[in-house]
UniProtKB/Swiss-Prot annotation:
One Gene Ontology cellular component: extracellular space
Tissue: Strongly expressed in two pairs of neurons in the pars intercerebralis (at protein level).
Location of this chain's protein in the cell: Secreted
UniProt keyword list: Amidation, Behavior, Glycoprotein, Neuropeptide, Secreted, Signal
One Gene Ontology biological process: mating behavior, sex discrimination
Consequence of gene disruption: RNAi-mediated knockdown in SIFa-expressing neurons causes normal male sexual activity towards virgin females but also vigorous courtship directed at other males and also leads to female hyper-receptivity with a dramatic decrease in copulation time. It also causes reduced sleep and shortened sleep bout length.
Modified residues (Phenylalanine amide): F38
Protein name per its UniProtKB record: Neuropeptide SIFamide
């Protein structure tokens, strides 16, 4: 009887531990790689060029899509 109780308690303990470890693993996130081997890349140089290209396209396209009536 004591052996059966001990085995049941051991099985329940293992199941609870497996459930708790599974839920704690879901919260873990690996840090981003960021090119630590090859050096870090600076995206600030590219951001201004991309933004100016987007603004240029918007300034050309918006007047065609939304014409302004200057009859004020």
């Amino acid at each position: 009887m004591a052996l059966r109780f001990t085995l049941t308690l051991l099985l329940v303990t293992i199941l609870v531990a497996a459930i708790l470890l599974g839920s704690s693993e879901a919260a873990y996130r690996k840090p981003p790689f960021n090119g630590s081997i090859f050096g870090k890349r600076n995206s600030l140089d590219y951001d201004s060029a991309k933004m100016s290209a987007v603004c240029e396209v918007a300034m050309e396209a918006c007047p065609m899509w939304f014409p302004q009536n200057d009859s004020k």
